[in-house]
């Protein structure tokens, strides 16, 4: 969450507006990210229908996303995708678009496809810095 918030703050400082999207299960994480970003960030996690989310993603210039359903929505509607892969792999579930950048550390322990790190460190995400993501924006 702190990496997303750091990236979001940088983007807001560069003049961008941030929309946080996701389901009800994403509300707590999105609230934490939104609170860290502050002004310039609109938290819509759990507050939109899937059709609303599709429309909003279609209006966006680009989407920074983890490997998720909304990543595939962004690819389908033609919005530029910056896809962050930690424990998953673009080899198995890539965004189906030519307008995508994949950001992954491709560690020896990944992909493990686990929500909880079996090694207890989550280096696949913790070491994937906001600066690395900014390089492909």
Which residues does each predicted region cover?
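Donor-binding and catalytic core of enzymes assembling or modifying cell-surface/extracellular glycoconjugates
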Residues: 1-86
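Nucleotide-sugar donor-binding patch of glycosyltransferase catalytic domains
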Residues: 43-44, 75-137
């Amino acid at each position: 969450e702190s990496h997303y918030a750091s990236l979001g703050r940088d983007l807001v400082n560069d003049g961008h507006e941030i929309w946080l999207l996701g389901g009800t299960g994403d509300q707590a994480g999105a609230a934490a990210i939104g609170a860290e970003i502050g002004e310039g960030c609109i938290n819509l996690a759990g507050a939109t229908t899937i059709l609303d989310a599709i429309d909003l993603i279609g209006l966006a210039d680009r989407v920074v996303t983890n490997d998720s359903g909304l990543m595939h929505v962004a690819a389908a509607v033609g919005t530029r995708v910056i896809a962050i892969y930690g424990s998953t792999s673009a080899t198995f579930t890539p965004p189906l678009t030519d307008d995508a950048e994949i950001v992954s550390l491709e560690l020896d322990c990944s992909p493990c496809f686990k929500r909880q790190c079996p090694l207890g460190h989550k280096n696949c995400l913790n070491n994937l810095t906001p600066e690395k993501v900014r390089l492909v924006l």
